[in-house]
Each structure stands twice: as structure tokens, then as C-alpha cells.
């Protein structure tokens, strides 16, 4: 983090080691395996997409602990409709907290966007058919994407996706 008054930066999370991040581990002294994207909820909790870790974590800032939300750590594309922690992700690079009670992730190498339901602990694909490509516009689950990286959810719940190799910003409107 950066102290905006002094301009001094310091490491806030991670040890510099490429190791798995254990569920429930303290924030200090724990490895963070390939953080690629960060978002925050209104309570001040951070959400991390870990590319090399093929996982998603909540950083519980009040308790000072990592909470494992999704991904087994193994590369793959599995688990849709089931428990998010048992799902396989492949290089997640984007993350967005949403006011609808979910967290959206760009599951980059699977060419999809998936939603974690924070109350149920489940995961579903919401955009993309899993094949690399470009479009067509229309039904979100039939759309091909090419390595989506960024995701953003606005106050109204509209989802925006940076579809990197298709050179487009896609939108799913509520």
C-alpha cells in the first residue's frame, strides 16, 4: 500500500513466495500465489483473483485472515452449479464485487466470466461458452470470448468485461 501523505509504499500482503494461500491463514506472513486483480466491498473486505493459484479469496480485514472462496488450485474448467471451493478455474485475472451478493471473476483461460454466490458458496458461468472466439452478441452463455481479463459491476448491476484478445468491452445489462 502507499501512504498518500508521504508517498512511501510497503508490502501489505504476501511474502514474495510462489506458494498456495491457506484458508484461514493470517494476513501477515502468508504467501499470495499470483495476485492479478483486487476489488473491495462496502465493509472494506478485499477480493483477490490469484492467477497462479487458480483461486479466489476474500481478505477479511477485520479478522485479519484469508477466506478461500473458489477454486481448488488446480487448472481446469469444472464445478459449474456446485460448490465454488470445489470448482476448477484456469488463470483468473479479473474480479468484481457486486451489490447482488456475488463476486464476478474473469476465468481468463477458460474464456468465461463466472459468478460466486457469496451466500450459497456456489459458482456458475454467466458469460461465455468456454470456447475461444469473438461473439456473437446475444445470449451471454452462447458468446465466445478471447481471454477476458477485466470485469466491473456498476451500481445498477450491469456487468462489463474487458475481452482482451477480441479487442472489445462487452456488457451484460440488467
Segments and roles (model prediction):
Residues 45-48, 102-105, 158-160:
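Conserved beta-propeller blade signature
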Residues 40-43, 97-100, 153-156:
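Residue-level detector of Asp-centered blade-edge/turn motifs that repeat once per structural unit
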Residues 94, 108-109:
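Loop/turn-rich, solvent-exposed surfaces of beta-rich toroidal or solenoidal domains
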Residues 4, 51, 61, 108, ...:
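Short loop/turn segments immediately following the C-termini of beta-strands
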Residues 1, 8, 54-58, 111-115, ...:
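A short loop-to-beta-strand structural motif that recurs across blades of beta-propeller domains
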Residues 147-174:
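Blade-level signature of beta-propeller repeat domains, shared across WD40, Kelch, NHL, RCC1
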Residues 6-34, 63-91, 120-147:
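Gly/Pro-rich loop segments of beta-rich domains
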Amino acid at each position: 500500500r502507499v501512504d498518500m501523505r508521504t508517498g512511501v509504499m510497503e508490502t501489505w500482503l504476501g511474502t514474495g513466495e510462489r506458494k498456495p494461500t491457506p484458508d484461514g491463514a493470517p494476513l501477515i506472513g502468508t504467501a499470495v500465489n499470483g495476485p492479478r486483480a483486487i476489488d473491495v466491498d462496502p465493509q472494506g473486505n478485499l477480493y483477490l483473483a490469484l492467477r497462479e493459484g487458480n483461486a479466489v479469496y476474500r481478505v477479511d480485514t477485520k479478522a485479519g485472515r484469508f477466506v478461500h472462496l473458489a477454486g481448488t488450485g488446480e487448472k481446469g474448467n469444472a464445478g459449474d452449479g456446485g460448490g465454488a471451493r470445489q470448482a476448477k478455474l484456469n488463470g483468473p485475472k479479473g474480479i468484481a464485487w457486486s451489490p447482488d451478493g456475488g463476486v464476478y471473476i474473469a476465468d481468463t483461460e477458460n474464456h468465461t466470466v463466472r459468478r460466486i454466490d457469496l451466500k450459497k458458496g456456489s459458482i456458475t458461468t454467466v458469460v461465455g461458452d468456454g470456447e475461444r472466439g469473438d461473439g456473437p452478441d446475444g445470449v451471454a452463455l452462447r458468446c465466445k470470448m478471447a481471454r477476458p481479463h477485466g470485469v466491473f459491476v456498476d451500481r445498477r448491476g450491469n456487468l462489463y468485461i474487458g475481452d482482451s484478445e477480441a479487442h472489445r468491452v462487452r456488457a451484460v445489462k440488467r
